[in-house]
């Protein structure tokens, strides 16, 4: 077969004409300095603030300080294999985490990667971690209750869907327990829960996950964990990752409860990063923008208006105080951002009042409008009664001869404290709460010995399940307070068969 010169030249010409150079241009830089989870990079002149950069071993970093001659990058992973002179390239992406139904029931790190040993997560959608909070006109006032199942909270400091309610107290006062109980009580409430563990021991997180699993709460919960052994950047971004996962559900019209446990450790991690990035320190060595650190996070909790589906994110941030000092920098910041606080006191905790909620210093600024009518009516005077009891209690220590009125007040106060006590991981449905608080405020418990109050409540709840179902259903379905006669007949009937202990 003869080869024609014309065919060869035509073939070469077409090849040359159709040739396309697939040259990719990547912006790269060089590591100048590395240590303590921070890298200084020379180059990367066009990098964006908050952009992800990739090191030679695949570890990602987050561009934080954009300076004239270098870029300060916080490293989101192990940095032992990164050394001076290594190449770093831009990714053109800002930080995103996987979101969606696939995340439910899983334990993930702040990057959305599974750490529970149950295989990969096949999420199809991602969302940027840093996002502007929902605007004013897209929101709606808080008007739906979020029941925690804890009598002292639902009666005295009620929480509404879309609210930010701070849980604050010293170490070992039951802050995490209050939050976990609130998650357990969302069973069958059509609420997705997200538990963000920041800077906690792995063993503690494991115990909490097991608690949720045993109660069947992991079926509607996502756990985001940045443990104490993780680098500071992961502790810093963990809450933002959690709320990003929650926003996906909120914008789809669902209700979300998110717990940040705790933001004190996040602030400490951010302080560490800022000092290593050589940003000027302020009060208590925190950087100047530590208020914005928490405000931009907590403002993302919202109740959307009906046009946007009416979804909500309710946030329960936790802050740990030192020796009850709520006037420190971070506690005062978060108190001013949130819509109220639940103050847990170690004195109460160690005297056996658990949950150790100090009713005088705890407040809910918007939850009152979300409280169901029945609870609002029966618990109306409860806070005042408790406050006057605490006052009288301190006076009663000095004198033994008390007048009848004072003695009655003290006796009612003792019973109030007993009724508001509650076991761990034992949330109580709101209709049962209304029942026992009605019995308390209307004087039905005045003749029951104080040591019998908890047993009375327990037996009364069991009795009501089978003998006062109509009453319970009416409270549950309408939210209104049934006729007092119905309560009277139920409580009186139960008291006939109740065995008081010998005083």
Swiss-Prot record:
Q: What class of enzyme is it?
A: translocase
Q: Which organism is it from?
A: Staphylococcus epidermidis (strain ATCC 35984 / DSM 28319 / BCRC 17069 / CCUG 31568 / BM 3577 / RP62A)
The answer to whether UniProt assigns keyword Membrane to this entry is yes
Oligomeric state and interaction partners are given as: F-type ATPases have 2 components, CF(1) - the catalytic core - and CF(0) - the membrane proton channel. CF(1) has five subunits: alpha(3), beta(3), gamma(1), delta(1), epsilon(1). CF(0) has three main subunits: a(1), b(2) and c(9-12). The alpha and beta chains form an alternating ring which encloses part of the gamma chain. CF(1) is attached to CF(0) by a central stalk formed by the gamma and epsilon chains, while a peripheral stalk is formed by the delta and b chains.
Gene Ontology MF annotations: ADP binding; ATP binding; proton-transporting ATP synthase activity, rotational mechanism
Q: Which InterPro entries match?
A: ATP_synth_asu-like_sf (IPR023366), ATP_synth_asu_C (IPR000793), ATP_synth_asu_C_sf (IPR038376), ATP_synth_F1_a_nt-bd_dom (IPR033732), ATP_synth_F1_asu (IPR005294), ATPase_a/bsu_AS (IPR020003), ATPase_F1/V1/A1_a/bsu_N (IPR004100), ATPase_F1/V1/A1_a/bsu_N_sf (IPR036121)
**Could you tell me what this protein does?**
Produces ATP from ADP in the presence of a proton gradient across the membrane. The alpha chain is a regulatory subunit.
Q: What top-level branch of life does the organism fall under?
A: Bacteria
Protein name in the entry:
ATP synthase subunit alpha
The UniProt annotation places ATP binding at 169-176
